[in-house]
Each structure stands twice: as C-alpha cells, then as structure tokens.
C-alpha cells in the first residue's frame, strides 16, 4: 500500500504521517528558496486550469491503468491501508497536497527553470523532467511509469509555455485526492472497473 499506518496509536500515527508529508513540503520550500522566491501567487483561473489538466490526465490514466492491470501488464496499486478511520481522509488529503507540492515545484518548476537557464531546449528539458518523473513512479508498475512520463510531458509543456505552476499543483492534488480518498471510500472495491 502507498499509505500505511505507522503506529497502532492513532495520535502517534497522525504525527508520523504529517511529519513524513512535511518532508515533501520542505523539498518544495527548498527549491523555492534556491529559485530566490520566484513563486507566482495563485489565481482563481488556476483552479479551472488545474481541473482541466486533472481530467486530461486522470480519466485516460485510470482507463490505461485498468486495462494494463486487466491484461497483467502492471501490478495493483493499493493507495491506502491506513487503520485509523477518523484520520484517514485528512491524512490522505495531506499526502495528496504534499505529493503535488513537492513534485510540481521540484521536478517541473525548479528543474525546468534551471535547465532553461543552462540553455537546454524545450524538447530535451521536457524529456529529462518527464523521464525523471516516470522513473520514480516505477515502483507502482510499468504503466504508472509510462503514465507519469506522459503526465510530465503535458505538465512540463504547460509550465514551459505559461510559467504557471499552481494549475499543476491543483491538478496533481485532484488526481491523487480522487485516487486515494476514492479508494478508501469504496473500501478497495474496484470491481466496477472490471479489475
């Protein structure tokens, strides 16, 4: 499971979960510091862009995952095995935002900014960033690696063109929140997907 209880005591588990998620927030904050505070403020329009990007990646991504799993080309990803129901949803939402914050700030905003400053062209920079993103998702299976490369290409292209990172953070948050909380709400029953 991607998210498991770290302690039998609910309060200790909650503290450990928040501290672990805090590491991802710290990575993003460090990247922002190294960029000398180049961080655009969120705009209301970013919510719409984020929802659109989440749908473009999330809906086909779910179909791709279900097909790959059905054909035996990937492994089943269990988003949560948390055992404290009253903290499960807040912890999963915190992890969703931490993942989005850390990945989009570091792997898209920081990395693409630095590669551009080093004179990399758009194709090389997007390929490098996307393959990096895909590679650290391979523990979820080959289909997750490929899907994250595609996600990285789209999100990287969007950032390269607009310089806006908030739509990416929102989109990533929505994808993870739907996957994590949706799985928990369904009690792990994904038979309606044919898997």
Please annotate each region the language model reported.
Residues 2-16, 35-100, 113, 117-118, ...:
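Juxtamembrane helix-loop-helix connectors linking adjacent transmembrane helices
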Residues 18-27, 86-90, 102, 106, ...:
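Membrane-embedded alpha-helical segments of multi-pass membrane proteins
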């Amino acid at each position: 499971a991607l998210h498991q209880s770290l302690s039998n005591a609910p309060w200790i588990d909650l503290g450990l979960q928040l501290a672990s998620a805090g590491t991802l927030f710290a990575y993003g904050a460090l990247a922002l510091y190294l960029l000398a505070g180049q961080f655009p403020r969120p705009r209301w329009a970013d919510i719409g862009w984020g929802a659109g990007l989440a749908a473009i990646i999330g809906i086909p991504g779910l179909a791709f995952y279900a097909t790959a799993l059905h054909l035996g080309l990937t492994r089943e990803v269990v988003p949560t095995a948390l055992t404290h129901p009253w903290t499960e949803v807040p912890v999963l939402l915190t992890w969703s935002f931490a993942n989005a914050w850390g990945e989009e700030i570091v792997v898209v905003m920081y990395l693409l900014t630095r590669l551009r400053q080093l004179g990399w062209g758009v194709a090389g920079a997007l390929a490098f960033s996307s393959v990096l993103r895909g590679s650290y998702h391979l523990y979820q299976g080959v289909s997750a690696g490929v899907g994250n490369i595609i996600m990285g290409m789209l999100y990287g292209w969007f950032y390269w063109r607009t310089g806006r990172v908030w739509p990416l953070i929102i989109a990533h948050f929505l994808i993870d929140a739907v996957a994590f909380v949706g799985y928990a709400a369904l009690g792990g029953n994904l038979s309606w997907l044919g898997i």
